[in-house]
């Protein structure tokens, strides 16, 4: 089967001030696959994830060396428009963060900000993305109600729909289910399975069972280094590195 490299990171180093947070990381992520980043707190996995849509640009005194290419383009080149990059690379955060707007306007927000004025198109896109986020049947009769009236799990699926509305090709998820109950978590995981038919998904998770359930490949990070990266089944059943084995068996973390 032909596979296309969607994200190509080459010898990435990253600093917060003098702190060397990521050390020499190289990785290829295939199109329409799910890759999970695991590792103990502070190991660099969320920092690396946020480099893919330049979220770390918002933090002062940071520095990056190496290259990150998406669809062959170095996203840190001077000519790259960060707004366009973030349309293509959507982000879903740890805690649901709906805007203080209606359910409908939460999803429509990105379209309006990007200058879409065709209300019929906006209505169609809102319906499509709410269906895509497995939320439409639950909210179709209350689109004008506040997003804050939704449960935590529904709010997180709304945030996924909001990220999808501007037609990205990559979805980044930073601990997307850590604040949710088990039933809501299962719905988000089921959704991730469905979404990979259309998107490349990179997920950071502390939940190793979740990584094993949803991802095709897993990367284990420790102290700013990527210790091991490979097929998820192999990482969890027969890792090559002792540190990976120790982490997944709970000897540290």
UniProtKB/Swiss-Prot annotation:
EC annotation from Swiss-Prot or TrEMBL: 7.3.2.1
GO molecular function: ATP binding; ATP hydrolysis activity; ATPase-coupled phosphate ion transmembrane transporter activity
Catalyzed reaction equations: phosphate(out) + ATP + H2O = ADP + 2 phosphate(in) + H(+)
Sequence ranges assigned to domain ABC transporter in this UniProt record: 7-248
Residues annotated for ATP binding in this entry: 39-46
Membrane topology: Peripheral membrane protein
Keywords: ATP-binding, Cell inner membrane, Cell membrane, Membrane, Nucleotide-binding, Phosphate transport, Translocase, Transport
GO cellular component terms given for this protein: plasma membrane
Stretches of the chain forming a coiled coil according to its record: none
Annotated GO biological process: phosphate ion transmembrane transport
Translocase is among the record's keywords: yes
Similarity field: Belongs to the ABC transporter superfamily. Phosphate importer (TC 3.A.1.7) family.
Subunit-structure text: The complex is composed of two ATP-binding proteins (PstB), two transmembrane proteins (PstC and PstA) and a solute-binding protein (PstS).
Described purpose of this protein according to its UniProt entry: Part of the ABC transporter complex PstSACB involved in phosphate import. Responsible for energy coupling to the transport system.
Protein name as catalogued: Phosphate import ATP-binding protein PstB
Species assigned in the record: Bacteroides fragilis (strain ATCC 25285 / DSM 2151 / CCUG 4856 / JCM 11019 / LMG 10263 / NCTC 9343 / Onslow / VPI 2553 / EN-2)
């Amino acid at each position: 089967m032909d596979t296309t490299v969607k994200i190509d990171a080459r010898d990435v180093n990253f600093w917060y001030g003098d702190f060397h947070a990521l050390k020499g990381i190289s990785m290829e992520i295939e199109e329409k696959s799910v890759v999970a980043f695991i590792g103990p707190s502070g190991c660099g996995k969320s920092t690396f994830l946020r480099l893919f849509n330049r979220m770390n640009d918002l933090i002062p005194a940071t520095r990056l060396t190496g290259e990150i290419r998406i669809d062959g383009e170095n996203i840190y080149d001077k000519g790259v428009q960060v707004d366009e990059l973030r349309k293509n690379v959507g982000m879903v955060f740890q805690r649901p963060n709906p805007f203080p707007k209606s359910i409908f306007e939460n999803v429509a927000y990105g379209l309006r900000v990007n200058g879409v004025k065709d209300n019929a198109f906006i209505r169609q896109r809102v319906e499509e993305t709410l269906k895509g986020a497995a939320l439409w049947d639950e909210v179709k009769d209350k689109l004008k109600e506040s997003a804050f009236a939704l449960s935590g799990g529904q709010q997180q699926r709304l945030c996924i729909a909001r990220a999808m509305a501007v037609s990205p090709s990559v979805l980044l998820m930073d601990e997307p289910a850590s604040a949710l109950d088990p039933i809501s978590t299962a719905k988000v995981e089921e959704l991730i399975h469905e979404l990979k038919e259309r998107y490349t998904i990179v997920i950071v998770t502390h939940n190793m069972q979740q990584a094993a359930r949803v991802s095709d490949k897993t990367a284990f990070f420790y102290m700013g280094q990527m210790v091991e990266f490979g097929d998820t089944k192999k990482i969890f059943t027969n890792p090559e590195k002792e540190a990976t084995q120790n982490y997944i068996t709970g000897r540290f973390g």
